[in-house]
Design a protein with these regions (language model features):
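Primarily recognizes the serine-hydrolase "nucleophile elbow" in alpha/beta-hydrolase
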Residues: 98-170
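Solvent-exposed loop/turn segments at secondary-structure junctions
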Residues: 6-7, 52-55, 84-87, 125-129
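Short, solvent-exposed loop/turn and secondary-structure capping segments
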Residues: 43-44, 57-60, 90, 132-135, ...
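Catalytic nucleophile-loop/oxyanion-hole region of alpha/beta-hydrolase
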Residues: 58-65, 80-114
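A fold-wide structural signal in alpha/beta-hydrolase
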Residues: 45, 71-81, 165
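N-terminal cap/lid segment of alpha/beta-hydrolase-fold proteins
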Residues: 1-41, 89-90
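Extracellular/periplasmic catalytic domains that process cell-envelope and extracellular macromolecules
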Residues: 25, 39-41, 71-72, 113-115, ...
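Short beta-strand element of the alpha/beta-hydrolase
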Residues: 42-51
Length: 170
């Protein structure tokens, strides 16, 4: 979702990666799509964030069960594989912010009609906390370069990062 440049506000993040880290230092956030086959029938689009308390991603028990269920109900879903520890909360939430913008930016090429359907996000536990932080600190036109001054914004960062609906769960 980030391309060649990714904002990082975590101090000395490379030193935080150990043998016990959930991801390796080369991890890059990405989205796993679950798209309605006939977009004219799609009821909306939902970003799904698993829990894991910012140290792991509980995808098998949460995101990978929820996304297919929403797809069966007629909703496009994207499971966000966001950064986790040793990255700080700002970096993790910027991944969510970027995913909102990324989906809005690419919606036309995927046939997703965001003019007539809603874009929302749901999160479990740590993912719910990330979602609440997005709504509190990373909404609208706030861009990553306001947190990481070395980051250079691109055309995707010019897209508004507001959601139509947010569903934080436990």
């Amino acid at each position: 979702i980030w391309g060649d440049d990714m904002p990082v506000t975590t101090e000395n993040v490379e030193a935080g990666f150990t043998v016990d880290s959930y991801d390796n230092a080369d991890f890059r956030p990405f989205l796993v799509p679950y798209l309605v086959s006939d977009q004219s029938q799609a009821k909306g689009t939902l970003i799904v964030l698993s829990g894991g308390g910012n140290t792991t991603r509980s995808n098998p028990n949460e995101a990978y069960r929820v996304a297919p269920a929403f797809l069966d109900l007629g909703y496009n879903c994207f499971v966000l594989q966001r950064r986790v520890e040793p990255y700080n909360n700002e970096d993790i939430v910027m991944d969510l912010q970027r995913s909102v913008r990324y989906i809005k930016y690419h919606a036309p090429e995927w046939g997703i009609d965001l003019e007539n359907t809603l874009l929302g996000a749901t999160g479990f536990s740590g993912g719910a906390g990330n979602l609440c932080t997005l709504m509190e600190k990373f909404y609208g036109d706030i861009t990553p370069d306001q947190f990481d001054t070395d980051y250079v914004c691109d055309e995707i960062d010019a897209v508004n990062s507001d959601l139509d609906i947010a569903i934080p769960i436990y």
